[in-house]
Amino acid sequence: MMFRLTSVSCFLLVIACLNLFQVVLTRRCFPPGVYCTRHLPCCRGRCCSGWCRPRCFPRYGKRATFQ
């Protein structure tokens, strides 16, 4: 009986540890200068054009001119 109780306890402990690792790994974030997406967030700053940056700068390019 003691062996069965110990093996069940170990099995439940393994399941609890796997759930904990899953939460830790899925909630990770990336430092500035690393590739990011909407599903892979940045730790600090924002995801600008696919890269973690402290702040996003406006994109320069062709703009409409008003007269």
Curated annotation (Swiss-Prot):
Subcellular location: Secreted
Major localization listed first in the record, in broad terms: secreted
GO CC annotation terms, alphabetical: extracellular region
Cysteine disulfide links: C29-C43, C36-C48, C42-C52, C47-C56
Propeptide segment residues: 64-67
Superkingdom in the source lineage: Eukaryota
Alphabetized GO MF terms: toxin activity
Modified residues (Tyrosine amide): Y60
Tissues of expression: Expressed by the venom duct.
Keyword Signal: yes
Residues making up the signal peptide according to the UniProt record: 1-26
Family membership: Belongs to the conotoxin I2 superfamily.
Domain comment (free text): The cysteine framework is XI (C-C-CC-CC-C-C).
Protein name as annotated: Conotoxin Cp1.1
Organism whose genome encodes this protein: Conus capitaneus
Lineage of producing organism: Eukaryota, Metazoa, Spiralia, Lophotrochozoa, Mollusca
